[in-house]
Amino acid sequence: LTPAVLSLLQSCQNDLDWNPVFFDSNQIKFISEITNLIIPSSEEVPGSNELNLIRFIDLYISNVKNNDDHIFIQSSLVSFIENYYIKSKKNSLINYEIEELDEILKYFFKSDVSKQELWVSDFNNSKNSILDGSIESSSNDALSFYFLKTIRDLTITAFKGSEYIGKNILAFRPVPGQQKGCVDLLETTNGRAWTI
């Protein structure tokens, strides 16, 4: 992560009055529940909602992603919401149920690798059509998978880059000492990854 992105993440953790920039408020609540299913809280580790990761995701997409990515994310979000409506038999983002969202996440992330590769291929083959405004060129599942994968990747990036996780959960040294290339991770950091 670059210093600019890290400062963006830090601002997300300190901002008490926040208005979404890229997503609307209903989408934010819905996506926030998805991020909380991806990284739930436990007794030892705070989850996505406690760390305000949705703020980072919204600001990161708005400030760092390019216009083409904005189109892909918005189009794939629309498809994912349609997919959610079909699978849950609902017609609003306001009355979502966590169990239904969890089932949809399992469907996409626990599917065969070959199915996921097919979705990625389908999405990649239809990028130009999506940019031209035709999301019908890609399957709902392919667009939904792209959206969920993007949100999952950003959630994990935000989690690993958050100050609390960096200082309290991951191995952290503000000024690294000596460099040792081949060491046992269990011995060096008790099996924890280094903070960013």
Q: What is the predicted role of each segment?
A:
Residues 1-11:
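N-terminal export signals
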Residues 26-30, 49, 143:
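Short acidic-hydrophobic sequence patches enriched in Asp/Glu that either
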Residues 13-15:
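Bacterial signal peptide processing site
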Residues 42:
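Short amphipathic, basic-aromatic surface patches that mediate peripheral association
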Residues 20-39:
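Post-signal peptide N-terminal segment of mature Sec-exported envelope proteins
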Residues 52-63, 67-196:
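Mature-region segments of soluble proteins
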Residues 45-46:
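N-terminal domain-start signal
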